[in-house]
């Protein structure tokens, strides 16, 4: 064109050719054929693609969880067996103790089913302990015998018969005989002279003179 003004031209063919190429390059068909996904957009169209592998997650494998369940079941079974054994033991034991059925010393049994006869129940006594117990019993019996007093026996009373006889005999004697006995009982001056001179007094001379006059 010949003219004075500038001319503008738009190449539509270039933009039109770019659009399908961008679409072709940006869109990637899904492996499963269910939809298209755009690279780098982070937005999924259609069904989501499963990126998880066939292996298990990082938390744990299914095989490990099954093994743990089996171990816990075994532990529970063992506990149940223990409780069952205790229950069976309680059922086998009598409701009352052995002491209410047997008087005396008995052996200690872990299981009453071990008793074959009644003769096995009493406890055997050591002969040395029996001898020692008898000796202690005899000593205590002797002490109690000597210290024991019969309450029915009457206490012994003092006898005064001899004194009564002497008083009766004195009543029968005359006054002269009594005087002779009194003189005989008095010690003579000669016997008293043998004593120390410090004991000599005038009263002794007077007594001697009286004795001479009586003679």
From Swiss-Prot:
GO biological process terms, semicolon-separated: positive regulation of DNA-templated transcription; response to cold
Q: What is known of its domains?
A: The Kinase-inducible domain (KID, 177-204) is required for interaction with HDA19.
Function statement: Transcription activator which may regulates gene expression through interaction with the histone deacetylase HDA19.
Q: Where is this site: Critical for interaction with HDA19?
A: 188
Q: Which domain of life is it from?
A: Eukaryota
Q: Where is this region: Kinase-inducible domain (KID)?
A: 177-204
InterPro entries xrefs: OxStress_Response_Reg (IPR051992)
* Compositionally biased residues, Acidic residues: 64-81, 162-175
Q: Which GO cellular component terms, listed alphabetically, does the Swiss-Prot or TrEMBL entry include?
A: nucleus
Q: Where in the cell is it found?
A: Nucleus
Induction notes from the record = Accumulates in leaf blades but fades out from stems in response to cold stress. Rapid but transient induction in leaf blades in response to inomycin, an ionophore of Ca(2+), suggesting a transient Ca(2+) influx.
Q: Which UniProt keywords apply?
A: Activator, Nucleus, Phosphoprotein, Stress response, Transcription, Transcription regulation
- Give a yes or no for keyword Phosphoprotein in this entry: yes
Name the gene that codes for it: KCP1
Q: In which tissues is this gene expressed? A: Strongly expressed in stems, flowers, roots and immature siliques, but not detected in leaf blades of seedlings.
Main localization is: nucleus
Listed under subunit, the entry gives: Interacts with HDA19; Ser-188 is critical for this interaction.
Using the UniProt annotation, give all residue ranges assigned to the region (Disordered): 1-132, 150-183
Q: What is this protein called?
A: KID-containing protein 1
Q: In which residues does the motif Nuclear localization signal occur? A: 129-137
Phosphoserine PTM sites in chain numbering = 188
PANTHER family in alphabetical order: (RAPE) HYPOTHETICAL PROTEIN (PTHR33172:SF51), OS08G0516900 PROTEIN (PTHR33172)
Q: Which residues cross the membrane?
A: none
Q: What is the effect of changing residue 188 to G?
A: Impaired interaction with HDA19
């Amino acid at each position: 064109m010949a003219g004075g003004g500038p001319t503008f031209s738009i190449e539509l063919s270039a933009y039109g050719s770019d659009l399908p190429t961008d679409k072709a390059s940006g869109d990637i068909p899904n492996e499963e054929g269910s939809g298209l996904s755009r690279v780098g957009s982070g937005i999924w169209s259609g069904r989501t693609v499963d990126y998880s592998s066939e292996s298990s997650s990082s938390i744990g494998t299914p095989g490990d969880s099954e093994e743990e369940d089996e171990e816990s079941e075994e532990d529970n079974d063992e506990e149940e067996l223990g409780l069952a054994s205790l229950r069976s033991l309680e059922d086998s034991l009598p409701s009352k103790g052995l002491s209410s059925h047997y008087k005396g010393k008995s052996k200690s049994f872990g299981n009453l089913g071990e008793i074959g006869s009644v003769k096995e129940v009493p406890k055997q006594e050591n002969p040395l302990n029996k001898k020692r117990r008898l000796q202690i019993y005899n000593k205590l019996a002797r002490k109690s015998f000597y210290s024991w007093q019969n309450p029915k026996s009457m206490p012994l009373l003092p006898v005064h018969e001899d004194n009564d006889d002497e008083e009766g005999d004195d009543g029968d004697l005359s006054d002269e005989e009594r005087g002779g006995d009194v003189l005989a009982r008095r010690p003579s001056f000669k016997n008293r002279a043998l004593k120390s001179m410090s004991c000599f007094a005038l009263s002794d001379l007077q007594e001697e003179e009286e004795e001479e006059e009586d003679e």
